[in-house]
Amino acid sequence: MPQTIVDCANGVLRDSEKHIITKTMAKELLSRKQSFFVKPTVDSCSGQGCVKADQGAKIEFSNGAMSLNGNIYTQYFVIQELIECNESLQRIYPYAVNTFRIITYIWKDSIQHMPISLRIGRGGKYVDNAHAGGIFVAIDENGVICNHASTEFNENYERHPDTGVKFEGYKIAQFDKVLATVTRFHEAIPQIGCINWDATIDKDGNAIVLEANTSDGGVWLPQMAHGVGPFGERITEVLQWLRFMKKIKPHERGRFTAGRMG
């Protein structure tokens, strides 16, 4: 995960060690950083509220909220160190943290994943979300980009519009670490059936998980990027299980999780 400088949970400020701190202490911690990244941690999506700020930013803390250059964050937010992507990701677009969207799900006795997408910034923006103007491409399990990039409006690009990098066949170095990391993380929390992970690779080659989204995740991104369904050849089996689960009383469904029907 990116290194936390300050976070706020239920209006309570904490440092990187999860110790409760005062408003003065929080401002002191931020004053030591040349730049940092701020984002809400609850009920947020599509890069909304994500802000990159510098040391001279106007910051005020008050009653479980923070004002940053006029942007208001309440109750739940995090302030993190900046991440620098590895060379192969930076070469495509250097101004954003380009991230992999990997949707994992538990099916019977293993962690499976839907088709993988790489989200990429453009136009000088430092966020890569499709709803914020970014583009996305299909990527295979070896870290190779499969085809052209698209926008959410199905505008297609054979090359990145800013850097000119050709997409199809481009290989992302050390991608295997990302896939292994999110799989291992999901194994640690089997109570959650499906997780939308946002992850990247830093300049030192480490897999970095930025977010684990456990609700409101959509399958439109991998479907649009790859042109295939999210469950592939497993789709018939999944639909049969869903039909079966509709007949089971809610309080009895725990016995039939992850594709089990008997």
Locate each region found by the language model.
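Active-site nucleotide/adenylate-binding loops and adjacent lid/helix of ATP-dependent enzymes
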Residues: 1-100
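C-terminal active-site "lid" helix and adjoining low-complexity regulatory extension at the edge
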Residues: 156-183, 187-192, 201-262
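Short, flexible loop/turn elements at secondary-structure junctions
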Residues: 8, 40-42, 81-83, 104-106, ...
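Protein kinase-like catalytic core scaffold
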Residues: 36, 112-114, 208
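Short secondary-structure transition/capping segments
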Residues: 45-56, 122-133, 157-164, 239-250
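A long amphipathic alpha-helix within ATP-dependent nucleotide-binding catalytic cores
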Residues: 73-74, 81-94, 107, 112-115, ...
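A short, terminal or domain-edge coil/loop segment
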Residues: 54-66, 128-144, 246-262
